[in-house]
């Protein structure tokens, strides 16, 4: 590529190219002037180290809990296990091999690791994204299309989908080990250094490749997740409205029948012939019906709160996906179509923090999908009994967590979810 050759030779006075992320293209600008702020490298190292430790710790705990606890091997958790593995790969094979060359202004790991890290980085990003899409579709099918989804919502089907996801990702990213190579250059102090570069034979191929990645790893997955979680939120919102109408109807019926008798138009009163079993139990227990009513009311309120929490969590998932990945995909597309302008504006500190933002997804995924779920926390306590137990929650919190757990696993049918508050509390 003539344009790249001229940039590497710095013939026009333009700094050598910066690598912008997804493909591990060295991720730094060589021979750049030192940062204007002396504290910037220290802050960069601190933030990278923090994200690295959180990601390794969080995903390792998720993998350990899901593997050692057989009771947690549900369909959704199988996808979460695959997601944790891909996020751990993203952290281990990307962050060190991006941060260290950035600081040293030299890719010191050799040609083999240049090819390997670019390949594993692309694969881990692809697997992570496709896993997020699979989780959203699995939840959508279980909540919004329960009858149709029963056929394929099995562990064996989930394992097949995960295997296909990994194989597809490895196949898609095969250009990286083929076209990633070390490119030597001479610094201003006459020292020789190397850049790990992913360079396709032509500018058109480079543009087509980054456009392809933008579509299959960002735009299309983002749209699918927005639609799936939007439909789930709509389903839950309709359930909330149904609960509210049922509660209102129950209050009206209670007000109209509070005296235990009915009045017709002639002014006569008709006493009920047979009291219900619930009334008999209330009389025998000396007002125990009030406690049953309070439990029912508490469970209904907890169910409502749980549904609202799930809706908020789904919104957070979509927002974080776009927040973490939009900057880096936009930067890669910008560089593919306008290399000079992108490298001038994004070199050095800006691209380093854009990359850091994309790596943040590998540490927030375990928090959103696992540690916010009470069943996973209980599984964690069972796997690591040395950890302190926070103690049993109250009845209202327990009912809400139970409902939220069922919703997060997407195991309820549309009818049962929408009519939860109309049914009696489980015995």
Swiss-Prot record:
For this chain, the annotated S-S bridges are: 18-29, 114-196
| Location(s), subcellular | Cell membrane
Disulfide bond listed as a keyword? yes
Protein keywords: Cell membrane, Disulfide bond, G-protein coupled receptor, Glycoprotein, Lipoprotein, Membrane, Palmitate, Receptor, Transducer, Transmembrane, Transmembrane helix
| UniProt xrefs under SUPFAM superfamilies | Family A G protein-coupled receptor-like
Q: How does it sit in the membrane?
A: Multi-pass membrane protein
- Any transmembrane segments, and where? 42-67, 78-104, 116-137, 158-178, 211-234, 313-333, 349-372
Biological role stated in the UniProt entry: Receptor for cholecystokinin. Mediates pancreatic growth and enzyme secretion, smooth muscle contraction of the gall bladder and stomach. Has a 1000-fold higher affinity for CCK rather than for gastrin. It modulates feeding and dopamine-induced behavior in the central and peripheral nervous system. This receptor mediates its action by association with G proteins that activate a phosphatidylinositol-calcium second messenger system.
Q: Which family does it belong to?
A: Belongs to the G-protein coupled receptor 1 family.
Q: What is the protein named?
A: Cholecystokinin receptor type A
Which species expresses this protein natively? Oryctolagus cuniculus (Rabbit)
Q: Which gene encodes it?
A: CCKAR
């Amino acid at each position: 590529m003539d344009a790249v050759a001229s940039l590497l030779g710095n013939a026009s006075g333009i700094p050598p190219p910066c690598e912008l992320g997804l493909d591990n293209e060295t991720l730094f600008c060589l021979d750049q002037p030192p940062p204007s702020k002396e504290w910037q490298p220290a802050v960069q190292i601190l933030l990278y180290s923090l994200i690295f430790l959180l990601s390794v710790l969080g995903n390792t705990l998720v993998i350990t809990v899901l593997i050692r606890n057989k009771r947690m091997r549900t369909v959704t958790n199988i996808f979460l296990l695959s997601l944790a593995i891909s996020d751990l790969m993203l952290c281990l094979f990307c962050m060190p091999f991006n941060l260290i060359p950035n600081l040293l202004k030299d890719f010191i790991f050799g040609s083999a690791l240049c090819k390997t890290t670019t390949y594993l980085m692309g694969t881990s990003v692809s697997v992570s994204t496709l896993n997020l899409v699979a989780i959203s579709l699995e939840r959508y099918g279980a909540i919004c299309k329960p009858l149709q989804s029963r056929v394929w919502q099995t562990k064996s089907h989930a394992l097949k989908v995960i295997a296909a996801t990994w194989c597809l990702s490895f196949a898609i990213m095969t250009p990286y080990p083929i076209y990633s190579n070390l490119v030597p250059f001479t610094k201003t102090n006459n020292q020789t250094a190397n850049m790990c570069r992913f360079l396709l034979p032509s500018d058109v191929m480079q543009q087509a490749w980054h456009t392809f990645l933008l579509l299959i790893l960002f735009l299309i997955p983002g749209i699918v997740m927005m639609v799936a979680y939007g439909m789930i939120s709509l389903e839950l919102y309709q359930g909330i409205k149904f609960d509210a109408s049922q509660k209102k109807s129950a209050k009206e019926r209670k007000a109209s029948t509070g005296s235990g008798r009915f009045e017709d138009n002639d002014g006569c009163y008709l006493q009920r012939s047979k009291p219900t079993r619930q009334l008999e139990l209330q009389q025998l227990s000396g007002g125990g019906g009030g406690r049953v009513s309070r439990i029912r009311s508490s469970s209904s309120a907890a169910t409502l709160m749980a549904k609202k929490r799930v809706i908020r969590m789904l919104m957070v998932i979509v927002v974080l996906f776009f927040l973490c990945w939009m900057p880096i995909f936009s930067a890669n597309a910008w560089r593919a179509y306008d290399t000079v302008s992108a490298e001038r504006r994004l070199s050095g500190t800006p691209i380093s923090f854009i990359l850091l933002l994309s790596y943040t997804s590998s540490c927030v995924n375990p928090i959103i999908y696992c540690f916010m779920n009470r069943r996973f926390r209980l599984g964690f306590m069972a796997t690591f009994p040395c950890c302190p137990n926070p103690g049993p929650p109250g009845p209202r919190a327990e009912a809400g967590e139970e409902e939220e757990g069922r919703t997060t696993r997407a195991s309820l049918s549309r009818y049962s979810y929408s009519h939860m508050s109309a049914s009696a509390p489980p015995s």
